[in-house]
């Protein structure tokens, strides 16, 4: 990835890793400038976040990547109807402050269905709450990074095809 640092073609390169702390994640952290990590609004997600912070410290201590930092935390699978979701968000914000994005990604049936159709949520249910949240997240990410880029709004398909349940 080193050539990408000097190549002005790309503003950002995202390395999307599986949700494990294995060798793929370690290699991605060795190559990354910062980590943007999704955290589910679930009790055990807090333990996972602690493990991620420790892994970042290990990468820094090993000398594999001295630039690496925890750049942001995105709260996902948020259900506003539950106290648990609200409490997890509050706890993570208390401990990590500004690193936690304001945008939260809601729990959504459509979001769960999209991969089984080989589509992103922006393609599968472009006008639904989850797609709107991901657009808001992209705008917030670019604002935080001072990027002049804009979020490309995908054309909306008829609302009847996009209704989230």
What are these regions (language model features)?
Residues 61-165:
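C-terminal lobe/tail of nucleotide-utilizing enzymes
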Residues 6-109:
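Conserved catalytic-core segment of NTP-binding enzymes
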């Amino acid at each position: 990835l080193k050539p990408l640092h000097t190549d002005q073609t790309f503003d950002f390169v995202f390395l999307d890793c599986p949700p494990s702390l294995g060798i793929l994640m370690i290699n991605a952290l060795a190559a990354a400038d910062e980590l943007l990590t999704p955290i589910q609004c679930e009790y055990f997600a807090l333990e996972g976040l602690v493990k991620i912070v420790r892994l970042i410290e290990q990468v820094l201590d090993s000398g594999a990547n001295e630039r690496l930092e925890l750049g942001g935390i995105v709260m996902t699978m948020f259900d506003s109807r539950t106290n648990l979701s609200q409490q997890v968000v509050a706890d993570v914000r208390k401990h990590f402050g500004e690193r936690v994005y304001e945008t939260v990604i809601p729990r959504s049936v459509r979001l769960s269905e999209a991969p089984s159709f080989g589509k992103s949520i922006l393609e599968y249910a472009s006008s639904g709450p989850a797609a709107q949240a991901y657009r808001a997240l992209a705008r917030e990410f670019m604002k935080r990074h001072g990027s002049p880029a804009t979020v490309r709004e995908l054309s909306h398909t008829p609302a009847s095809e996009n209704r989230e349940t």
